[in-house]
Amino acid sequence: HTSAAVGRPKVDSAAETIRALNPDVEVIPHRTRLTAENALGLLDGWDVVIDGTDNFPTRYLVNDATVMLGLPLVHGAVLGFNGQVGVFDARRGPCYRCLHPAPPPAGSVPSCAEAGVLGVLPGIIGTMQAAEALKLVIGGGQPLLGRLALLDAWGAHLREIPVAKNPACPVCGENPSITALVTEADTCVVPRTPEVE
C-alpha cells in the first residue's frame, strides 16, 4: 500500500497494485469481512490460502476453515522486529491450532499499534510466504510444513522450530471439539482513536 491509498479499503489498494505489477493476473477482490458465516464459501475452491491477517480472531478463523476445507495454509505474522512464516496443512501435518490451541489471554500480547512493526518486515515475511505458496502450487522444494521459520530482524537471525501435529488439537486432532466455524473473541482490541480533521 502507498500513502496515496490511506483511507481506501485495503482490498481495493491491493487489487490496484497487483494489476499494475502484472496486468495478466486475474484479481478477484472481495470487499467484505471474513466471518464464521462466509469463510467456507470465500475460501473454498482455492489451491492455497495465504494468511497475512493482523488479529487473532481472523487468524484462528482462517486456520479452522482451511482445516475443514482440506486446504494448505501459508501463515505469516509480524510484531516489532520479529516475524514468522509456516505452512499448515492438517492432511499432511499440523494446523495452526496444533501450535497455539487457543488465542492468548486478553492483554498478554501487544497489538501492532502498541508494539509497532519494523517497516520492512511485512515485505520480508510476505515474500517468504509467496515463496512457500509457490512451492505448494508447483509441488517443488521443501515447504515449511511442520516447521516455523522465525526471523529476528533486529539481530539478523533466522531460525526454525519444528511444529508437531497435536493428537489433542481441537480442530484437526483425533477427536476434534471444533466442528463448526466460530469467531473467537478479540483479545487484542485497540480502541480507535478519533479521526483528525
Per-range role (PLM):
Residues 1-197:
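Adenine nucleotide-associated cytosolic modules
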